[in-house]
Amino acid sequence: KDAKRTDTIILANFDPITKEAKLISIPRDTRVKIGGKSQKINAAYPIGGEKLVKQLVGNILGVKVDYVVKVDYEGFRGIIDAIGGIDMYIEQDMNYDDPGQDLHIHFNKGETVHLDGKKAEEFFRWRKNNDGTGLANGDVDRIKNQQKFINAVIDKVLSVSTITKIDSIAEILNK
């Protein structure tokens, strides 16, 4: 099976002294040189695997990347379901259908929606509507939505009610 292009790239940095974690998103359309050709960074994994992704992200940010964590859509959905879903405020209408991927995204602006794993995937992946409208700054605004979502996930994971679900989350991550 052909490897697919990477949907989202996030560098996590943990400072053991301050015990703070920082997340930096790399826009999927960032242009990099791969094999002497200018390509989008989201092509790096299918071309050169983890090694190439680590190298390119490290070069862009001027850091050494020690580890790579890969989460496919199934794992993503499983993690969100394991923590009981996430509540998100929808800041703009989201209406997109891609029957080829069985992807159907329909959220209304102004609503707070409880996202189970499938709905969370839809929210996380949304970039534009069927009519071409969408985020003014494309992937940069998509990253902002993703960061809000990730912050909500972190808050929930750190909550007392979720601590009891750590074993099932670890099991999903080990797949």
Locations of regions flagged by a protein language model:
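Non-catalytic, solvent-exposed segments at the cell envelope interface
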Residues: 1-175
